[in-house]
Amino acid sequence: MRGLIDPDLLFPAEERTRALARRLYAEVSGLPIVSPHGHTEPRWYALDEAFPDPAQLLIVPDHYVFRMLFSQGIRLEELGVPALDGSPVETDGRAIWRRFCENYHLFRGTPTRLWFDYTLSELFGIDELPSAASSDPLYDHVAECLTRPDYRPRALYERFNIEVISTTDSALDDLGWHAKILESGWKGRVVPAYRPDAVVDPDFQGFPTNLDKLGDITGADTGTWSGYLDAHRTRRAYFKDFGATSTDHGHATADTANLPQAEAAALFDKVRLGKANADERRLFRAQMLTEMAKMSLDDGLVMQIHPGSFRNHSPAILAKFGRDKGFDIPTRTDYVTALKPLLDAVGLERDLTVILFTLDETSYARELAPLAGVYPALKLGPAWWFHDSAEGMRRFREMTTETAGFYNTVGFNDDTRAFPSIPARHDIARRVDCAFLARLVAEHRLREDEAYELARDLAYGLAKEAYRL
């Protein structure tokens, strides 16, 4: 590595342990990337067009970036974040880039700083930190790179050594971009994941219309409970035809329910007609998690649950800029009681995989590791979102390994919209895990040959196996 990234990044300071971490890392640094969960756009791979200017690629869509800048008084309009009402925002990519570079010091100590340093150094060959003075030269260099064929999406997919990448797609998506990828003959593997929030959450914008659309595209009668469930089965099968191996569920809580079908049907009728109160809407979401788990047992799709985010905390930002604009905040999350109805129904099934994530780190050792350490259907997803920093990944290992071990976890997933940062995120995860394993060997808690095997599993094998890729 060159420039902004030290070869010993994130390795232990103690010399003997650091030397072992280096050796472990040398064994895994070149392994292919399995990216089983993320938010890149299938359109990029289908069209394989040049990315836009540096700001539109690296700044405007990245909520990790603009939320920090916003916290320091820089308006989202100044960063080019589009407003829903079409009101003016900055469109000059160079001006947006300059604001970012002038404030690069704000990211010191954050994972965003590591990801950007890595991307600038390893992808663009830059060895100078962003600053007011370096802003224009860096912009010109990155912009020139983006005009070249070797910086287009498919070329970068291959350069990053990606073996497979999953997008996250609405249950209502026609998967047209995925179809174009398959029709193109390109050998890259881009698969969808079934995200049904728009048709299982009564509080989702346009829910009644979404139910009608679900019926239209499946031919099922979504005016009835049985027809509604059949519509989900049809869509899941459609996603599987395009290579999907997983579903994803972004609920506010991990609450589940397992009502008798007659009660579930009556609840669905109230929800569909807009007559359900807040408790009934919550109960419906809980019931649907269990229904999705039962369907996963039937069709083999791995189920991911990403609960615990207070979405769109600022109503003013939501009204002006829409969802996913940096105002999603972690909340306390219960799993032991919340998941019990689902686990009572299907938790002992060895052929089911439910991957649990959390934004509440206090639940790692108290709830999640003990649950995954005994229920065959459960696995622990890696440190997520606010916690996918080097420190967050260390905390995850330290708080879960003693109870769940390594093999009830699923390796790493980058969960990103920022395509250029994917190799950075995987590299940092591999470094953190190699450092953790080296420490266990140094403390005589793990044999060195076991550490090498574990390093490969954590970097590659566990994700591939858990997500059935």
From Swiss-Prot:
UniProt cross-references to InterPro entries, sorted A to Z: Metal_Hydrolase (IPR032466), Uronate_isomerase (IPR003766)
Any one GO MF annotation of this record: glucuronate isomerase activity
Catalysed reactions, as listed in the record: D-glucuronate = D-fructuronate; aldehydo-D-galacturonate = keto-D-tagaturonate
Pfam family, one: UxaC
Pathway named in the protein's UniProt entry: Carbohydrate metabolism; pentose and glucuronate interconversion
Keywords assigned: Isomerase, Plasmid
Record-linked Gene3D superfamilies: Metal-dependent hydrolases (3.20.20.140), uronate isomerase, domain 2, chain A (1.10.2020.10)
EC number assigned by the record: 5.3.1.12
Source species, domain of life: Bacteria
Enzyme class (EC, first level): isomerase
BP GO terms, sorted: D-galacturonate catabolic process; D-glucuronate catabolic process
Family: Belongs to the metallo-dependent hydrolases superfamily. Uronate isomerase family.
Matches recorded under HAMAP family: UxaC (MF_00675)
Protein name, per record: Uronate isomerase
Annotated organism of origin: Rhizobium meliloti (strain 1021) (Ensifer meliloti)
Taxonomic classification: Bacteria, Pseudomonadati, Pseudomonadota, Alphaproteobacteria, Hyphomicrobiales
